[in-house]
Amino acid sequence: MVKNQAQKRGVKRKQVKNIPSGVVHVKATFNNTIVTITDPAGNVISWASAGKVGYSGSRKSSAFAATVAAQDAAKAAMSSGLKEVEVGLKGTGAGRESAVRALISSGLIVSVIRDETPVPHNGCRPRKRRRV
C-alpha cells in the first residue's frame, strides 16, 4: 500500500479549466510585444511576449516576434478550451496588427477588436525630445 508523493503530502493536482470565451490583451510597445489571455473576470489563462519566445534586443520589437508570441499564447489557451476571444490593443508598436492576425490564424474566433491605447488628457509633462 505505497502512495505516491503527491498523495502523501495532500497536494492537490492542478485542474484543467474549460473556458470557452476570453479576452486577449495585446500591449505593443516600441521595444516589445506582450500578449496576455484572460477569462472574462480577468484571471490570466496564458501569456507570452517576444522576449519569452526567444527573441532579444531589437528583434523583440519586430512584427514577426509579435506573431510568434501571439501564436504561443493562443496555443496554451486553446489547450484549456478557449474558442472565442475579444481583443484589446494597447500601444503603437510594430506588433499590433500582426498579433491579431496570428490569433485568427491559430484558430481562435475574434468577436471584437478594441483599441485601449491610453491617451493623456494633457496630464504629465513629457520627457525632452530625443535628438539623434
Swiss-Prot record:
GO terms for molecular function: rRNA binding; structural constituent of ribosome. Keywords: Ribonucleoprotein, Ribosomal protein, RNA-binding, rRNA-binding. Pfam families: Ribosomal_S11. GO terms for biological process: translation. One of its GO terms (cellular component) is ribonucleoprotein complex. NCBIfam families: PRK05309.1, uS11_bact. Part of the 30S ribosomal subunit. Interacts with proteins S7 and S18. Binds to IF-3. This is Small ribosomal subunit protein uS11. The lineage of its organism: Bacteria, Pseudomonadati, Chlamydiota, Chlamydiia, Chlamydiales.
